[in-house]
Amino acid sequence: MRALVVYESMFGNTHRMAEAIAEGLSAAIPTSVLPVGSADQDALAAADLLVAGGPTHVHGMSREATRAEAVRWAGAPESDLTLEPSASRDGIREWMESADNLPGLFAAFDTRADAFKWLTGSAAGQIAKVLRRRGSKQVVPPGTFLAPDNDADGTEVDRAREWGRALGEAALAARGVTASAG
């Protein structure tokens, strides 16, 4: 079994969470991590488990307009935000809609502002809905991690790593494999 973590990140927070999730997941399953712009069909075809994530923008997944707004924020003279190199490309929404041969298993995660979920919404819920509609089976409930400013809180990174570890165990169980048998 192999896992692929595909993420969209504007300012680095979702990227950090994707790496932490992959670290936890790799304790049970060999795992690769790719930004959405680099996740091609070959990488997808090699995976049995897709872990897809992105930032929450305006109550859900990013859109072209919200990504353009993030680019403007980072470019403002008073801004201390650093844009990820792949930030202005297509997001996780566009990637999922165009991806062929999705793995049979998936998990979804997002990052969001440190506010009540009913105020911020959740990209992970929408990601999960798309992947279920495309025929994949959800392994665990979506993971949501707080992303304050341009530097995700260390406790959230730890939570993401633990979520990845639990995901690995659940994915193996879904496949009828024990963690010790790897």
Task: Please provide the spans of the model-predicted regions.
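N-terminal beta1-alpha1 ligand-phosphate binding loop
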Residues: R2-A28
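Hydrophobic anchor at the start of a short beta-strand
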Residues: A3, T31-S32, Q138-V139
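Short histidine/acidic/glycine/proline-rich micro-motifs that form metal-
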Residues: F11, R112-W118, F145-N150
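Short, well-ordered alpha-helices that flank and scaffold nucleotide-derived cofactor binding pockets
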Residues: E19, E23, A27, K129, ...
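Short gly/ser/thr-rich secondary-structure transition/capping motifs
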Residues: A28-G37
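Glycine-rich phosphate/pyrophosphate-binding loop and the adjoining helix
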Residues: R132-G182
